[in-house]
């Protein structure tokens, strides 16, 4: 039986029997079976079209013909490991170098963002001779054991915090200790990192690196205050550590204004290491780590060869080059600026209309909507967010939630997402929020629709917003 003709229930049963339940699905109560993608759209087994607002992996659009053709043509000729000379890997490194500050001139190619961050940790420790890492609260940097250790998002539910890991407050000016009314939140949050470093040093610890997503995503689509990372870098360098910018979810023009999100700090700010993944290959497993000559030479001085079987293979590099070509020829970075500004403006208008929307923030096609139960305490509207994304799915719009309170709507669509798509999403969001408010006024319990065979539908009892 062809997979695309197999009934959804059969596929789900096979998955439940053959795959671990820890490998979770979107919309677990009623998952979507996707069999085809094109541009910003996904299609299920019944041919229904969904607007994809989640998938920042299909960066230039699902199954972009230029990317597909590049992979196909290179596969017809050669795909082998990178120990042989080949033009693709050096051409790709050259093209990437043109997007980065000149100091970041050495490239390592890998297969996933997790591999890139793991290698960044190795290089930082080798260069500094130190062991410890400073990270932001609720951060996520990958699924390898080394990265779970530096990801509070994961380790708080597992073995806990290692003694060599030090957690600084998330620079969230909406929910954190230093908010929008603080005179200098960038300095205040950077001083928190300084205090974390000082506390570690008093215990005899030495800092190897500070890891942060240039715009924290899993943490809730956070936009750190301008100047924060520059000041953090000063504190980290003073402690003898390196600054690692994790661009895996936010790089390659997504923020519109710049190609890399760390460039929001200004042209004088240069991380010591930059890691890339997800969008870099438009769904093909490609990743990269860029660093300085000095850091790379320290790693080379160990005398231990670094080899990655599939990293930088001819097909992966052909795909990476094709993604860069599409970004340029279709002017998707400028497109992200224009469409993102439109979406941000219209979501902000919804904030004035619906009290459940506490904050709208973002840049380019990286946008978060913080849902609250009340304006004074800013209590996360966790259940309401779950209900909302379920209703959006019923309207063929795929959106996810994240953040410590699981109440942040995350907009990270393919870069071809357009103004018509933005208008459609905002209109549906408005309709559903209006309906939710009507149900609250009538004290009606909201229910997430489950498949017909589910006899225990999830119930969500909402409370009224404070006046």
Swiss-Prot record:
Enzyme class name: lyase
Catalytic activity: (5R)-5-phosphooxy-L-lysine + H2O = (S)-2-amino-6-oxohexanoate + NH4(+) + phosphate
Source superkingdom: Eukaryota
Chief location bin: mitochondrion
Modified residues (N6-(pyridoxal phosphate)lysine): 278
E.C. number: 4.2.3.134
Entry keyword set: Lyase, Mitochondrion, Pyridoxal phosphate
GO MF, one annotated term: lyase activity
Cofactor(s) the protein needs: pyridoxal 5'-phosphate
InterPro entries, per database record: Aminotrans_3, Aminotrans_3_PPA_site, PyrdxlP-dep_Trfase, PyrdxlP-dep_Trfase_major, PyrdxlP-dep_Trfase_small
Subcellular location(s) per record: Mitochondrion
CDD domains tied to this protein: OAT_like (cd00610)
GO CC annotation: mitochondrion
Entry keyword annotation includes Phosphoprotein: no
Cited function: Catalyzes the pyridoxal-phosphate-dependent breakdown of 5-phosphohydroxy-L-lysine, converting it to ammonia, inorganic phosphate and 2-aminoadipate semialdehyde.
Family: Belongs to the class-III pyridoxal-phosphate-dependent aminotransferase family.
UniProt subunit comment: Homotetramer.
Protein name stated in the entry: 5-phosphohydroxy-L-lysine phospho-lyase
Lineage of origin: Eukaryota, Metazoa, Chordata, Craniata, Vertebrata
């Amino acid at each position: 039986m062809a997979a695309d003709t197999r009934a959804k229930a059969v596929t789900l049963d096979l998955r439940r029997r053959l795959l671990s339940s820890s490998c979770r699905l979107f919309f677990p109560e009623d998952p979507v079976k996707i069999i085809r993608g094109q541009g910003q759209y996904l299609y299920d087994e019944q041919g229904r079209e969904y607007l994809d607002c989640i998938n920042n992996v299909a960066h230039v659009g699902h199954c972009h013909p230029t990317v597909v053709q590049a992979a196909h043509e290179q596969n017809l000729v050669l795909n082998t490991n990178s120990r042989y000379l080949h033009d693709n890997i050096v051409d790709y490194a050259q093209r990437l170098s043109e997007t980065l500050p000149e100091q970041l001139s050495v490239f390592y190619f890998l297969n996933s963002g997790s591999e890139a961050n793991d290698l960044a940790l190795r290089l930082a420790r080798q260069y500094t001779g130190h062991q410890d890492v400073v990270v932001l609260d609720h951060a996520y940097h990958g699924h390898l054991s080394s990265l779970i250790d530096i990801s509070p998002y994961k380790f708080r539910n597992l073995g806990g915090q290692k003694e060599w890991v030090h957690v600084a407050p998330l620079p969230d000016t909406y929910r954190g200790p230093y908010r929008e009314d603080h005179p200098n939140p960038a300095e205040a949050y950077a001083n928190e990192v300084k205090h974390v470093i000082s506390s570690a040093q008093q215990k005899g610890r030495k800092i190897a690196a500070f890891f942060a997503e240039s715009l924290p995503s899993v943490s809730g689509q956070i936009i750190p205050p301008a100047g924060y990372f520059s000041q953090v870098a000063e504190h980290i360098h003073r402690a003898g550590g390196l600054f690692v910018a994790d661009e895996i979810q936010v790089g390659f023009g997504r923020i519109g204004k710049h190609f890399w999100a760390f460039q929001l700090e200004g042209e004088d700010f240069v991380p010591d290491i930059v890691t890339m993944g997800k969008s870099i290959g438009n769904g093909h497993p490609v990743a990269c780590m860029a660093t300085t000559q000095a850091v790379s030479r320290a790693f080379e001085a160990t005398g231990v060869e670094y080899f990655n079987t599939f990293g930088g293979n001819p097909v992966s590099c052909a795909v990476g080059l094709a993604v860069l070509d599409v970004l340029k020829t279709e002017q998707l970075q400028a497109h992200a600026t224009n469409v993102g500004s439109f979406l941000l403006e219209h979501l902000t208008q919804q904030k004035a209309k619906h009290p459940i929307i506490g904050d709208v923030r973002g840049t380019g096609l990286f946008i978060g909507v913080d849902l609250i139960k009340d304006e004074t305490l800013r209590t996360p509207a966790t259940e309401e967010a779950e209900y909302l994304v379920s209703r959006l799915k019923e309207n063929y719009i795929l959106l996810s939630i994240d953040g410590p309170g699981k109440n942040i709507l995350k907009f990270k669509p393919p870069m071809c997402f357009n103004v018509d798509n933005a208008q459609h999403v905002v209109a549906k969001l408005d309709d559903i929020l209006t309906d939710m408010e009507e149900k609250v006024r009538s004290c009606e319990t909201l229910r997430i629709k489950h498949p017909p065979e589910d006899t225990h539908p999830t119930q969500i009892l909402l409370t009224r917003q404070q006046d």
